[in-house]
């Protein structure tokens, strides 16, 4: 389905200042390099300014400073990237689900499904589950016993919710995600691992997004908790009892060990790992591949990953790391010897 919106309508939608033809028809979005004569683009990152003069876009989202030297159609906004985010939903080709229950769905007698919800083929909804208004369940989703999905939720095909998973409003969960799987809990008895029942659940706040193949384990006793507005990328592992504060975002392949607490408005880049039973305060940024081994009490950016080098240089650096203990001992010896020399450069009476 092709959407056509006039440039003037987009300006009104954004509250933007229009420079150019308000009747210009816009049919889609594209990058500066690839946009055609009916598509809207944007300039948010200065490194792409070099493409501004040659773009074929019908119109651009620009800051005022960039719009001054641009002769084409423009929507002038304070933040072009944020404006692009808002407009993107107007051109989203994702099919809209229709209300109703597919005849192949299996629904427990005491489950409650709002009439406005869309339940796709081969969905399973177990006893005591509750599905809110305008919820979409894609094909082959499983909603476990006593689990709840708040209004406006959207679950892609093959999402699995175990029992006692509570999901807030307007939550988006992508395919393959598993919420409420048993946490990794075992007690050691003379070298043999004894399983610990995971009797907590999972609680997800409002406006959360959960990526493809991400796993959020149920709590051992209390719930694993994901706050409002949290954004989780693909292939993230969140262990039992973890708590994630509101509006924290995590990129792919983050791993969080059990009982760790992460504050509000944090950002975790790809491949970050956290040990268990630590606390991360609000407004912390962890760069890619950082390994967090203790609590963080001060906001700011933290790193521990090794930056990329040419392979030959990296091998030399790795070899030097193995020599650090010896270098440290030699440095201490030099410091001791230098301390035995008097200020005038002569050896002390102690020789």
From Swiss-Prot:
Keywords: Acyltransferase, Lipid A biosynthesis, Lipid biosynthesis, Lipid metabolism, Repeat, Transferase. This is UDP-3-O-acylglucosamine N-acyltransferase. It comes from Pseudomonas fluorescens (strain Pf0-1). Belongs to the transferase hexapeptide repeat family. LpxD subfamily. One of its GO terms (biological process) is lipid A biosynthetic process. Its EC number is 2.3.1.191. Homotrimer. One of its GO terms (cellular component) is membrane. NCBIfam families: lipid_A_lpxD, PRK00892.1. Pathway: Bacterial outer membrane biogenesis; LPS lipid A biosynthesis. Pfam families: Hexapep (PF00132), LpxD (PF04613). HAMAP family: LpxD (MF_00523). It catalyses: a UDP-3-O-[(3R)-3-hydroxyacyl]-alpha-D-glucosamine + a (3R)-hydroxyacyl-[ACP] = a UDP-2-N,3-O-bis[(3R)-3-hydroxyacyl]-alpha-D-glucosamine + holo-[ACP] + H(+). GO terms for molecular function: N-acyltransferase activity. Coiled coil: none annotated. The keyword Transferase applies. The active site is at 240 (proton acceptor). Catalyzes the N-acylation of UDP-3-O-acylglucosamine using 3-hydroxyacyl-ACP as the acyl donor. Is involved in the biosynthesis of lipid A, a phosphorylated glycolipid that anchors the lipopolysaccharide to the outer membrane of the cell. It comes from the Bacteria. The keyword Transferase applies.
